[in-house]
């Protein structure tokens, strides 16, 4: 039978998250990472396999990279946005516009999850299910906020580690995934991504 509490791929994300928070505990910072593209406050991150599949090089613009990534959505695929940003009506509306742009162009199913809450539900399917998802993870510069009792890191650092850890597992599973990190105004950046997705920019 099916054990609804068996979530091996959720545990894999937890393991990667713990590695990152342990690193912060020891060094006072998360491991360094290098963006593939940075443009006007939006940085794109992905592993070597996705970078190669997207044909990224020094001349690739952010718009080109996003369009190429969305162009990987084929018949039978779904598109998922994994948003590690504040869950509010403004952000949800901006993310919905991106989903609607993909839906109107491709006709594929789309879904949205706010992290880290989705990790214990759809997060298992994304990593342990069929490889028919195309993912865009969205993160931003959160205020570090309240410290975790007994630890050197804050809940903001934990959230960042959860996002990076989950993305690492998606990469390990060979998923088509990128991360867009927003350093400035989140709503304006999402609007820009929506324009790119709809082909208006």
Regions from the PLM with identified roles:
Residues 1-201:
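Phosphate-moiety recognition in structured ligand-binding domains
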């Amino acid at each position: 039978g099916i054990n609804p509490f068996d979530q091996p791929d959720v545990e894999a994300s937890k393991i990667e998250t713990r590695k990152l928070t342990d690193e912060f505990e020891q060094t006072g910072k998360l491991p360094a990472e290098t963006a593939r593209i940075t443009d006007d406050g939006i940085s794109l991150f992905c592993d070597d396999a996705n970078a190669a599949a997207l044909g990224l090089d020094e001349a690739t613009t952010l718009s080109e990279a996003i369009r190429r990534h969305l162009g990987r959505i084929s018949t039978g695929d779904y598109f998922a946005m994994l948003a590690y940003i504040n869950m509010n009506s403004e952000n949800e509306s901006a993310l919905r516009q991106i989903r609607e742009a993909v839906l109107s162009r491709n006709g594929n199913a789309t879904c949205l999850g706010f992290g880290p809450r989705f990790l214990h539900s759809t997060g298992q399917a994304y990593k342990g299910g069929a490889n028919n998802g195309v993912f865009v993870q969205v993160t931003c510069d959160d205020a570090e906020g309240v410290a975790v009792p007994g630890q050197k890191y804050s809940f903001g650092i934990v959230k960042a580690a959860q996002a990076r850890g989950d993305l690492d597992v998606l990469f390990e599973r060979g998923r088509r995934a990128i991360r867009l990190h927003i350093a400035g105004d989140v709503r304006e950046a999402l609007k820009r991504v929506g324009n790119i997705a709809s082909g208006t920019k």
